[in-house]
Amino acid sequence: IAMTRGQGRSLWDSEGREFLDLFCGFGAGLLGHCHPDLVAAVTAQANELWHVGNLMHTEPQTRLAEAIATHGFGGRSFFCHSGADANEAAI
């Protein structure tokens, strides 16, 4: 099956058939497909800076870290590359 587009919870294949996306993909895939607010936020950030890795920080990352720390986790936040990194840090 060759998927060609998505909207919300639905996917469409190259033959125009609609599917309910119960897989959700990885990472942010659980947020659905092409939500206008997410598309706008990603576009705005891509127009400023695409990616710098986690050895440096950015202003949006700092805001997110502060929000996470404010709402729990002992006043701390930590960004890493993978679930394995997150588990090791938690241990």
Predicted segment positions?
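Active-site-adjacent loop/helix segments that line or gate small-molecule/cofactor pockets in enzymes
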Residues: I1-S10, L55, Q61
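Glycine-rich loop-to-alpha-helix module at the N-terminal edge of alpha/beta enzyme cores
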Residues: E18-I91
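Short loop/turn microsegments at loop-to-beta-strand junctions
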Residues: G6-R9, E15, F26
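Generic preference for hydrophobic/aromatic residues in regular secondary structure cores
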Residues: M3-R5, L11, E66, R76-S77
